[in-house]
Amino acid sequence: MRRFPDEEHHLAEDRGKKIGMVLTIDLNADIGESPERLADGSDAELMRYITSANIACGGHAGNALTMEQTLELARQNNVAVGAHPSYPDRNNFGRIALNIPLADLQNSIADQVSELVAVARRLKTTIIHVKPHGALYHSCNRDAEIARALGRAVLAINPRMIVVGQAGSACLSIYQHLGLRTAAEAFADRAYEPDGSLRNRNLAGAVLDSPECAAAQAVSLGTQGRVLATSGAELTISADTLCVHSDTPGSAAIARAVRERLAAAGVAVRALRA
């Protein structure tokens, strides 16, 4: 993974990490992935504390009804909304990289994003960003052609949409060379390896499910652009947006702690804006 590029169209330059003397960062989560979480109020509770929602749009989860419900939740909470496309693989929740032709993948991504855009248009809502899900997210980090396929799908729908990718990944430069704006993402609730990759979820300590630990990591990222790796080494990561995973146990409590600690540290939590 190429680390910490100087990115021409990066939001760290367009928006800035500072507005005046105020540090700013976005707080995002993946929403609308489970009808059960929508029904029991879990997504609604999490939505209270984030500023951007990545909405499942049919590839790994979600349908027209859940998209509409999630968009309405976002409207009620003044949360910016984005598309969360994946490999077309509902059976595996988009967690496995599929070996399919690039043209088919690009068309699938475009179809997923377009479906959410159509639902949003009916509700008079604008889709601000696109963040790939699961295996597609990591494939974009590793494979330039897959990143280009995603970028071209976004360009064909709305070239003003922001594409979210992992901070330090070469995919951000690929999106920028296509003419897209990008947002570099870091993770409040995931452990980092010394090379800057996320710790495998199958290993102990991969997920920071303590609100205090996640909030401390978020503050370090938001104020200093630094995070401690599992080895104890300090990594430098410049991020425009922080992610809290909705499937992390106690995700709403984590998001609340992150937002409160960021505010206490003088960081304004503000949504991505196209």
Question: Predicted regions: what is each one?
Answer:
Residues D30, H84, V130, V244:
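Conserved, mostly hydrophobic/aromatic
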Residues P35-E68:
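A short alpha/beta connector and helix-capping loop motif
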Residues A39-D40, G62-L73, N141-E145, G168-Y175:
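Active-site-adjacent beta->alpha loops and helix N-cap segments on the catalytic face
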Residues E45-R48, T70-G82, R121:
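Acidic (Asp/Glu)-rich catalytic clusters
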Residues I55-H60, S139, R160-A167:
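Catalytic beta/alpha-barrel core
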Residues R90-L123:
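Glycine/small-residue-rich loop that forms an oxyanion/phosphate-binding "nest" at active or ligand-binding sites
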Residues M161, A253-A274:
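C-terminal domain-boundary segment and adjacent tail
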Residues A170, I174, L178-R226:
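Active-site rim beta-loop-alpha module in soluble metabolic enzymes
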